């Protein structure tokens, strides 16, 4: 099976590993993305974290409430300078207003604002992209924006201050699910199988490995779920414990961050200047 550039890029985005590592991993698994990720974790090829400069595109996250829902929008540009430009922000807010008016789909937003986008690109000189729009329903919603780059909306049954603090926690801690039991069964099963294999590779018997994995799995589902995480304002307690104390409940949340999954090209300014000088000498 031929491995495509798109597959390699997806694996790079998800693991932070090098291009050749990703291509080799996909070749070995005949294009099976999930198996490639598991194999890379075992071999240590996947990096623990990706450099922010390799994934962070610029732009803004905007939030606006509609009737019984909230809209979250990401609009991208190429530089942080343009992200603060009044023309760019006016365009982004116009798109947001349309989205919040009637839950317009991303495709319809792109079509509706294509002429305005093209005009803005011509005026500013950078590529502009309406990247994402998400909607969250709820009679009781609280939002939080961390600068221009992170936006969170939380839906739940709690007082305004509690929901606001939970939204701030979501912004900082990046949970993927509300509760540990919300983690899909296939994700749990895959992680459990991987942990058992890794434990046995450490020389543990199958019986001991399974017991060790029980604790690891509780930690795994807790770390990626909101109520299982340590609360940033009281780290000795989980978010779930804080909510229980307050008689509160979170039913859903959405968190968007500018540039998630986008690899931003590293610019070598010195090399660029040298190339320009060399070109001018040839002219």
Curated annotation (Swiss-Prot):
It comes from the Bacteria. Pfam families: EF_TS. GO terms for cellular component: cytoplasm. It is found in: Cytoplasm. Residues 79-82 are annotated as: Involved in Mg(2+) ion dislocation from EF-Tu. InterPro entries: EF-Ts_dimer_sf, Transl_elong_EFTs/EF1B, Transl_elong_EFTs/EF1B_dimer, Transl_elong_Ts_CS, UBA-like_sf. GO terms for molecular function: translation elongation factor activity. Keywords: Cytoplasm, Elongation factor, Protein biosynthesis. CDD domains: UBA_EF-Ts. Belongs to the EF-Ts family. Associates with the EF-Tu.GDP complex and induces the exchange of GDP to GTP. It remains bound to the aminoacyl-tRNA.EF-Tu.GTP complex up to the GTP hydrolysis stage on the ribosome. This is Elongation factor Ts.
């Amino acid at each position: 099976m031929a491995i495509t550039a798109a597959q390699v890029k997806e694996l790079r985005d998800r693991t932070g590993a090098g291009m050749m590592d990703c291509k080799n991993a996909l070749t070995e698994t005949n294009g099976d993305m999930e198996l490639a990720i598991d194999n890379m974790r075992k071999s240590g090829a996947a990096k623990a974290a990706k450099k922010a400069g390799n994934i962070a595109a610029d732009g803004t996250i905007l939030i606006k409430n509609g009737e019984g829902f909230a809209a979250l929008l990401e609009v991208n540009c190429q530089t942080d300078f343009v992200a603060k430009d009044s023309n760019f922000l006016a365009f982004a807010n116009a798109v947001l207003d349309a989205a919040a008016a009637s839950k317009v789909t991303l495709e319809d937003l792109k079509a509706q604002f294509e002429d305005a986008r093209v005009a803005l690109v011509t005026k500013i000189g950078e590529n502009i992209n309406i990247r994402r729009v998400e909607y969250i329903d709820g009679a009781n919603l609280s939002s939080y924006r961390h600068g221009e780059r992170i936006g969170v909306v939380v839906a739940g049954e709690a007082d305004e201050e509690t929901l606001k603090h939970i939204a701030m926690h979501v912004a900082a801690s990046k949970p993927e699910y509300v509760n540990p039991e919300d983690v899909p069964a296939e994700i749990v099963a895959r992680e459990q199988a991987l942990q058992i294999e890794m434990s046995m590779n450490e020389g543990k018997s199958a019986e001991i490995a399974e017991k060790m994995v029980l604790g690891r799995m509780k930690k795994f589902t807790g770390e990626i779920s909101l109520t299982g995480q340590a609360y940033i304002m009281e780290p000795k307690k989980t978010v779930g414990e804080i909510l229980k104390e307050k008689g509160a409940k979170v039913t859903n949340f959405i968190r968007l961050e500018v540039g998630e999954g986008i690899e931003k090209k590293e610019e070598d300014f010195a090399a660029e200047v040298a190339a320009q000088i060399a070109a001018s000498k040839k002219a």
